[in-house]
Amino acid sequence: WLSESFRVLKDDGRIAINVPIEMNVQERGGRILFNSEFWMRMKEVGFKFFGMVDLTEDSPHRVRQTAWGSWMSNSAPYIYNPKECVILAYKKSSKKLTKGESQWKGTPTEVKDEEGNVKTKMFYEDEDKKEFMNLVFGRWEYFADTKSLTKATFSLDIPSKAIKILTYKNDIVLDPFMGSGTTAVAAETLNRRWIGIELSENYTNIAKDRVKPFVASNRQLKLDI
């Protein structure tokens, strides 16, 4: 699927993939630095590195902190990092080749420089500037999804943040694993076009029911699933 994602992306297309930092893979002999190995696979496909975002959950779940038999002992402490990250990459151009409508709208204002020349400068609301700075900082705080519709359910905050910073309005967002439709909801809410792919009929029905209200209240008149 990585190869197919690379193939269908435009030359200035970006990709954002949410992965755990580490995993326990018995077939590989135990724990591995998963995000690093996943990036190497992306690099082999042809993706170029755009950045990495550290995800910080507002109320992180707790996991086993010590291995069996090592409680209050140095013998075999199980040191586990439950954190996840988002790997950002692009196809050929890190800069958008076609200008689009940004997520943040500034107000053009004429100002004079020290020599009295009049220039036009864009001014942005403080909240917009704060949001932009938080998105480019590389650490995104998100609220956990407590209403799990499927095993594939994840926080709406994550795709929303990625879509805001990586795409223009009316761009096409592709989710190759649609699940319960979280990315589609984020894209629809933020005025992006979207395509969702899902093999499970059960998940497809769940996503369809979830996305329909947002489509009906927004600009799309027809939902094809």
Stretches with model-predicted labels:
Residues W1-I206:
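Core catalytic lobe of class I
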Residues K208-L223:
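Short, conserved SAM-binding/catalytic segment
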